Amino acid sequence: MENFFNQFFENIGEDKNREGLKETPKRVQELWKFLYKGYKEDPKVALKSAYFQGVCDEMIVAQNIEFYSTCEHHLLPFLGNISVGYIPKEKIVGISAIAKLIEIYSKRLQIQERLTTQIAETFDEIIEPRGVIVVCEAKHLCMSMQGVQKQNAIIKTSVLRGLFKKDPKTRAEFMQLLKS
C-alpha cells in the first residue's frame, strides 16, 4: 500500500516525505477497511438472523435510513437516504436488520441503481413479502466536484417488487406515507 501512495504522491507532484503525509498511507488503509467492509459481510445472513414469524399483514415502512457509498466510476462518495416499504406474507424483519442490509451493500464500490436493486432483491428473496419497494435519494460528489459540477442535484432510484409493482394503490399508499 505504501508503494501505491508513494506513486500517487509522485504523480500529483506532492512530496511523499512531507510531514503531513508520512502517516497518510496507514490512515487511508484503515479508512478503506471501514469504507469497504461490506465485502466481508453477507447481506443475506444479516436479514436471516433478524426475522420472525409475523402477525402483521399491512405495510411497514422504514424511512430515511441514511447511507454513504463510493461511486465505482470515480471513487468519490455519494450519500443520501433510503426508504424501504414491504407488505409481509409470513415474516417480519427487525428494523435494525433493514439498516444493516443497507450498510452492507453501501460499504462496497457501487452505483446507485445497483445498490437500490440489491437491497430490494435480497429483501424479496429472504423475507418473501407480498411486496417490497426501495427508494434511494442521493447526492453524488462526482457530479458536484467534476464534470457538470451541479452542486444541488439529487438522484432518485426505485425498485418495486410484488404488490408495489402490480398495484398502483399500494404504490400510492407508500408514496403518501413518505410525504407525511
Curated annotation (Swiss-Prot):
Key words of the record: GTP-binding, Hydrolase, Metal-binding, Nucleotide-binding, One-carbon metabolism, Zinc
EC number per UniProt: 3.5.4.16
Positions bound to Zn(2+): 71, 74, 142
Catalytic activity: GTP + H2O = 7,8-dihydroneopterin 3'-triphosphate + formate + H(+)
Pfam families found in the cross-reference section: GTP_cyclohydroI
Disulfide bonds: none
Domain of life the protein comes from: Bacteria
Enzyme class: hydrolase
A GO cellular component annotation in the UniProt record: cytoplasm
GO MF entry, a single one: zinc ion binding
InterPro entries in UniProt: GTP-CH-I_C/QueF (IPR043133), GTP-CH-I_N (IPR043134), GTP_CycHdrlase_I (IPR001474), GTP_CycHdrlase_I_CS (IPR018234), GTP_CycHdrlase_I_dom (IPR020602)
UniProt pathway annotation: Cofactor biosynthesis; 7,8-dihydroneopterin triphosphate biosynthesis; 7,8-dihydroneopterin triphosphate from GTP: step 1/1
Gene Ontology biological-process annotations: one-carbon metabolic process; tetrahydrobiopterin biosynthetic process; tetrahydrofolate biosynthetic process
Protein family membership: Belongs to the GTP cyclohydrolase I family.
HAMAP family assigned: FolE
Subunit architecture: Homomer.
Name of the featured protein: GTP cyclohydrolase 1
Species: Helicobacter pylori (strain P12)
Gene: folE
